[in-house]
Amino acid sequence: MSFKKLNIPLKEALERLKIENPLPFQKQILPKIKSGRDLFIVAPEGSGKTTALVISTIQKLESAAFEDAPRALIFVQNKEAALALEEEFNKFTKYMDLRVYSAHDAPDISKQKDDIYDGVDIVIATPKKLFQLFKITGINVSQLKILAVEDAEFLTKNSDYNDLIRIPQHITKCQYLVFASTMNPKIERLKDSFMARAEMLRLKV
């Protein structure tokens, strides 16, 4: 898949960032993500997984804000990963009205709930924080289109894994994406939960 098939605001963002062509693995996975399938996406660092996640999420949300409920939830390991991914999204969405919000393990959960209630499109958070917000009705999943896990190796921690699998139980329909550098038994176990129908995509070398 070339970048020519992306929507105009996203193509303009890529031009501004001087990203001219997809990397080989991105060519392989971008059409699969666009198809709406649930996917395990496994490739080493440097293969372009994070950029593919950002591009695919923005494309799926049509590069524009819509109502107030989040349409994308992205799980990450910790505060540093949440802020880094938020910064990456902000590079692409600088001239769009998409609203990106990172809810990391800061103490004031009531403020985070209010911020999200005011209207966001993409929420980036740790499993613990998202589940805490969900328990106090701080996350409305009725409009959700995509749920992704970035660098899923961190799920070896039981508390992260358990918090993660609880939220999809309340989601009627959305696309699930799990990105990882390598597979491990804990990631494989997601097949027993919300990744039951997922296809495995590995970097072809």
Task: Give residue ranges: language-model regions.
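The conserved Walker
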Residues: 43-47
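Conserved pre-motif I regulatory segment
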Residues: 1-42
